[in-house]
Amino acid sequence: METLAKRLDACQEQLLELYEEDSKHLEKHVQHWKCLRIEAALLFKAREMGYAQVGHQIVPALEISRAKAHVAIEIQLALETLLQSTFGTEPWTLQETSYEMWHAEPKKCLKKQGRTVEVVFDGNPENAMHYTAWTFIYVQTLDGTWCKVYGHVCYAGLYYIVDNMKQFYCNFKNEAKKYGVTGQWEVHDGTQVIVSPASISSTTTTEAEVSSSGLTELVQTTDLYNTTPTPTTITRSNCDPDGTDGILYKDPTPTTPPRKRYRQSLQPPTKHLQHYGVTNVPVDPGSQRVTSDNNNNQRRNPCGNQTTPVIHLQGDPNCLKCLRWRLKKNCSHLFTQVSSTWHLTEKDYTRDSKDGIITIHYYNEEQRDKFLSTVKLPPGIKSCIGYMSMLQFM
C-alpha cells in the first residue's frame, strides 16, 4: 500500500509540473499522456487489491480506470508516431493534444485553428446550430504515416481531403433532419453564406448565363432588394456527397459611388412612369416584370439610330439603391450602364412622390430582353421600357 501511494504521488506530482510548464513541445505532451497512463494503471491495481482510497486519492471503479488507461495508451502511441514525423517539430499546446480534441469531430485526428460555422435551418435565424470547422487537420493514414490537410466548408457539410477522397465529418443534411422541417439550410462561415441552389431556383431566383465562361450563375432575388448590404459575390461550392452544389456569397468590398449624374427628359409626372416619345408598357403585377406588347411598333426604336433601349425602375429609394448595387455585382453582363437614383419634380421643384427612379441602359433590345427574362424585380418596384438619346452627355 505504501509503495503504491508513493508511486501515485510521484506520478501526480509530475503531472502538476507539466501543467504548470504549459510547454509547446510535443515531447512534453507525450510524457503527459504517459503519466496519465501510469496513473490509471496504479488506480486500477489499487482497486483490484480492494483499496477504496490511496492517501487522499479516491480509487474509482475498475471499468473507469481501465477506460482511462486505454485512452491514454491510444493517444500516447499516436503522439509518439506524430513526434517522429515532420510535424513533430511544430508547436503543440496541451489543449491541442487533449482527450477532448482527439475525440472531437473528426475523431482520432489532431486539429488546429478551429472556427465556428453557423447553420441556419428552415431560414429561421432562431433555429441555428454551431459547428467547428478546422483550418488544419492531421490525419494518420492506414500505413501509419501522418499527413496535414486543410479543412473545408461547403453546403453539404465539413470535410477534408485525403488521397483525393473527401472525408465528411459533419453532414448538414443529417443535421437538418434533426433540427429542421423543410430540409433546407444556410451555412454561415464568417463573412460567407452558402445556400442551396435547388432552393433558390425553386423559390426566388432565376438563372443567368455567363457568356464569357459558359457557366451558370444563380442570382438570389431576395438579395436584390434586401435593404441591408448582404453578401453578393457568387461562386460555386462544388463539394457535396449527395451531388447538390452550394452557392457561396461573399461580402462585397466597398466601391466608390458613381460620379457622373445626369438628367433625363420625361413627360410631366403622372401616376405611371412615362418615357419621352414612348407609350407606357404595362407591368404584370404578378411577376413584377415588363410584359412585351404584341405590336411590333413597340419594339421598334422610334428615335433613330442614336438612341438606346432603357428600362426605368421606380420605387423606394433605399430599395433601388440596394437593387442597383446587386445588379452591378451579379448581373453586370446583362446591361451597359445604370443611373444613380433620381426623382420626378413638379413645376415648383417639389417632389411628386417619395419614390425614386433608376434607369438601366442596354446595348440593344436583345440584351434588354435577356435582362427581363433573367432578373426578377423585387415587389413594389414598378418598371417600364423605352428608349433614350443623347448618351454622349453621360
UniProtKB/Swiss-Prot annotation:
Posttranslational mods: Phosphorylated.
Q: Which GO terms describe its biological process?
A: DNA replication; DNA-templated transcription; regulation of DNA replication; viral DNA genome replication
Q: In the UniProt record, does the keyword Phosphoprotein occur?
A: yes
Q: Which GO terms describe its molecular function?
A: DNA binding; DNA-binding transcription factor activity; nucleotide binding
In terms of one coarse class, where is the protein primarily found? host cell
Localization, per the record, is: Host nucleus
**Does Ribosomal protein show up as a keyword for this record?**
no
Give the span(s) annotated as Disordered: 226-309
Q: What InterPro entries does UniProt report for this protein, alphabetically?
A: E2/EBNA1_C_sf, Nucleotide-bd_a/b_plait_sf, Papillomavirus_E2_C, PPV_E2_N, Reg_prot_E2, Regulatory_protein_E2_N, Regulatory_protein_E2_N_1, Regulatory_protein_E2_N_2
Top-rank taxon: Viruses
Q: Which Pfam families match?
A: PPV_E2_C (PF00511), PPV_E2_N (PF00508)
Give me the ranges of the annotated region DNA-binding domain.
307-394
* Physiological role: Plays a role in the initiation of viral DNA replication. A dimer of E2 interacts with a dimer of E1 in order to improve specificity of E1 DNA binding activity. Once the complex recognizes and binds DNA at specific sites, the E2 dimer is removed from DNA. E2 also regulates viral transcription through binding to the E2RE response element (5'-ACCNNNNNNGGT-3') present in multiple copies in the regulatory regions of the viral genome. Activates or represses transcription depending on E2RE's position with regards to proximal promoter elements including the TATA-box.
- The protein, known as: Regulatory protein E2
Origin organism is: Human papillomavirus type 32
What are the leading ranks of the lineage? Viruses, Monodnaviria, Shotokuvirae, Cossaviricota, Papovaviricetes
